[in-house]
């Protein structure tokens, strides 16, 4: 076969296969171009899920008539000169418009701010026509019709019109969160019109824009994040652990304003929530990373969806540390969705007939967010808490003992035969975040009263979290006990993996794992954590080597130890069906208030829900 040059049309179609995956990819490229042009108003119109029509209109700086032909030519751009490592624009390759034009019927109209009239060019299957004059307001209009008509095989891979329209909406929302000063609107024959009004600049404006996308409920269950380390800043908002979702569609990440779906960022997010939500649940988060463009490579993915950090360990550590700190400082806080679900259940049974229709979860107004109550009694913190109860001095349950020795010192476990009774709630206890215990129902749920709400606590789930946190603190307070192997286990590894693992020997020793290099391509394991019992040493070492190679951390072993602690806590905590005295119930409530993360159990389930008095009154038609 003869080697020959490909035609420009074929080259662009190949590029389109990388850049233009579906109609939403076209919208992403066109909206990013509009943002780079300084637009403050962007309108998107679609038809047929974007396969029939895509139109993006903006009021940006526009393109001069003599540059329109260049704009649809391959590798022509105004955003990049000679430094590919200092990229400050969303687009920079000069591939999008020619790639789109090679597989569709594209019309580009533009009028710069200082021009008397507009001009347009048309590209049909890669063939250019124009420029020629056209009537146009200042700004740019890009219209794409019959997407993939020139490559019909691609159409077979398209989803339904509704699915493609939904993907377009998701793209616009993701971009819109990072640019609250821009007004976005979507319309068309294949969708319900959607609009995001401009909210301005700054943190308050970003909050309002997030509310437009995620709804009022997120604002009521979000924690602010703001941290910086070695020139990398992390800002944004994350949901409390009990406010989670069944998929990761409500996770948004941005690097220097660019929306990305980087597995490293979302992996760090998952790691931060590893012991506070269930494995099959996902946190809700909006994260903004800001750093020197020279410290991140955005030119590693055709659609610029992934990035590569110069120091990935720094970024991961910043994300995990900042989120864990925010979760720890948030105190106890239930998700509003739990109480709402209970109220809905009452309404479904016919309660509260006079109740007005509840506000939809996704309804939003800036005023409602600003006036929404923050975390209940946010002035409270574990440091200022002073338990007003009789301390329980019982020993840890048998399940918390290992080899006859207590793994955890004293754990407050109420007596098995205690009987509950309704007592008059002291006023000072009702002022506490979780109030005063009034009763125990079904020998599993503690009913407490605050000044303005009713609190229902799952005693087993709550005590499970308390024991788990105490176990973790014990693990971190002193080195983990190890057990010597009669015969050291030799694990063969690639030489570079063995060297990296040996470099973390001191850290691993704190967790009871004794390793040392055994020749150029092997690791000798002489000691393993006693808590883990019998284990597959070979698999553990290989997993740790992979983790260190990817993240430069050895968190996997710590995660395993935490998992064992969680299992021990589950078996060693107060069981359902156990009767508690009022003072023991109050002791549990006070311990919850003093323990970060006590709003969820080790499996991610809520430990309590709170019903406001106003909601209860509505159920009975009093409001």
Swiss-Prot record:
Transmembrane regions: none
Record Pfam families: DNA_mis_repair, HATPase_c_3, MutL_C
Molecular function per GO: ATP binding; ATP hydrolysis activity; ATP-dependent DNA damage sensor activity; mismatched DNA binding
PROSITE patterns tied to this protein: DNA_MISMATCH_REPAIR_1
Keywords associated with the record: DNA damage, DNA repair
Region entry Disordered, spans: 353-389
Any one biological process term the GO annotation gives: mismatch repair
CC per GO annotation: mismatch repair complex
Record keyword Transcription regulation present: no
Compositional bias annotation for Polar residues: 353-368
Protein role: This protein is involved in the repair of mismatches in DNA. It is required for dam-dependent methyl-directed DNA mismatch repair. May act as a 'molecular matchmaker', a protein that promotes the formation of a stable complex between two or more DNA-binding proteins in an ATP-dependent manner without itself being part of a final effector complex.
Family in the record: Belongs to the DNA mismatch repair MutL/HexB family.
Name of the protein: DNA mismatch repair protein MutL
Species per Swiss-Prot/TrEMBL record: Brucella abortus (strain 2308)
């Amino acid at each position: 076969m003869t080697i020959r040059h490909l035609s420009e049309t074929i080259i662009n179609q190949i590029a389109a296969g990388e850049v233009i995956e579906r109609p939403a990819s076209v919208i992403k490229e066109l909206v990013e171009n509009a943002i780079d042009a300084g637009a403050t108003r962007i309108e998107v119109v679609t038809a047929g899920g974007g396969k029939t029509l895509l139109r993006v209109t903006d009021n940006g700086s526009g393109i001069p008539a003599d540059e329109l032909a260049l704009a649809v030519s391959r590798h022509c751009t105004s955003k990049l000169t000679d430094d590919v490592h200092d990229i400050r624009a969303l687009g920079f390759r000069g591939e999008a418009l020619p790639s789109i034009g090679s597989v569709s019927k594209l019309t580009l109209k533009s009028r710069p701010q200082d021009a008397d009239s507009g001009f347009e060019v048309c590209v049909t299957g890669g063939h250019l026509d124009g420029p020629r004059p056209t009537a146009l307001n200042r700004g740019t209009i890009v219209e794409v019709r019959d997407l993939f008509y020139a490559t019909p095989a691609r159409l077979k891979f398209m989803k339904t019109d509704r699915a493609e329209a939904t993907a377009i909406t998701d793209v616009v929302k993701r971009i819109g969160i990072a640019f609250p000063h821009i007004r976005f609107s979507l319309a068309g024959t294949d969708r319900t019109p959607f609009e995001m009004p401009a909210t301005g600049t700054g943190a308050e404006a970003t909050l309002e824009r997030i509310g437009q996308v995620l709804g009022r409920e997120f604002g009521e269950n979000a924690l602010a994040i703001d941290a910086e380390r070695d020139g990398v800043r992390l800002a944004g908002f994350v949901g409390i652990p009990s406010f989670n979702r069944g998929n990761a569609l409500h996770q948004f990440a941005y690097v220097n304003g660019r929306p990305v779906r980087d597995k490293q960022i979302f992996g760090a997010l998952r790691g931060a929530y590893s012991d506070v939500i269930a494995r099959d649940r996902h946190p809700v988060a909006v994260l903004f990373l800001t750093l020197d463009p020279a410290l991140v490579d955005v030119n590693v993915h055709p659609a610029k969806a992934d990035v590569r950090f110069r120091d990935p360990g720094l970024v991961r550590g910043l994300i995990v540390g900042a989120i864990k700190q925010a979760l720890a400082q948030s105190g106890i806080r239930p998700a509003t969705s739990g109480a709402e679900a209970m109220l809905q259940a009452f309404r479904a049974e016919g309660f509260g007939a006079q109740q007005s229709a509840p506000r939809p979860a996704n309804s939003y107004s800036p005023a409602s967010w600003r006036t929404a109550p923050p975390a209940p009694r946010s002035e409270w913190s574990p440091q200022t808490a002073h338990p007003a109860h009789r301390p329980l001095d019982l020993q840890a349950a048998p399940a918390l003992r290992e080899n006859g020795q207590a793994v955890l010192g004293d754990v407050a476990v109420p007596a098995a035969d205690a009987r509950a009774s309704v007592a008059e709630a002291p006023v000072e206890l009702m002022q506490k975040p979780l109030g005063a215990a009034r009763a125990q129902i079904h020998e599993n749920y503690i009913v407490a009263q605050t000044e303005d709400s009713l609190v229902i606590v799952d005693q087993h789930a709550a005590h499970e979290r308390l024991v788990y946190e105490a176990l973790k603190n014990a693990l971190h307070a002193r080195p983990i006990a190890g057990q010597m192997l009669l015969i050291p286990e030799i694990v063969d590894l690639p030489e570079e993996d063995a060297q990296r693992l040996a470099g973390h020997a001191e850290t691993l020793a704190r967790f009871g794992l004794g390793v040392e290099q055994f020749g150029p391509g092997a690791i000798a394991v002489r000691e393993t954590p006693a808590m883990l019992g019998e284990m597959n040493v070979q698999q553990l070492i290989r997993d740790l080597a992979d983790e260190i190679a990817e993240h430069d951390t050895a968190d996997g072993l710590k995660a395993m130890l935490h998992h064992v602690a969680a299992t021990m806590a589950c078996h060693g905590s107060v069981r359902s069906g156990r009767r508690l005295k009022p003072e023991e119930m109050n002791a549990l409530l006070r311990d919850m208030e003093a323990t970060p993360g006590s709003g969820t159990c080790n499996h991610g389930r809520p430990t309590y829900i709170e019903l406001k008095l106003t909601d209860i009154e509505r159920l009975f038609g009093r409001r």
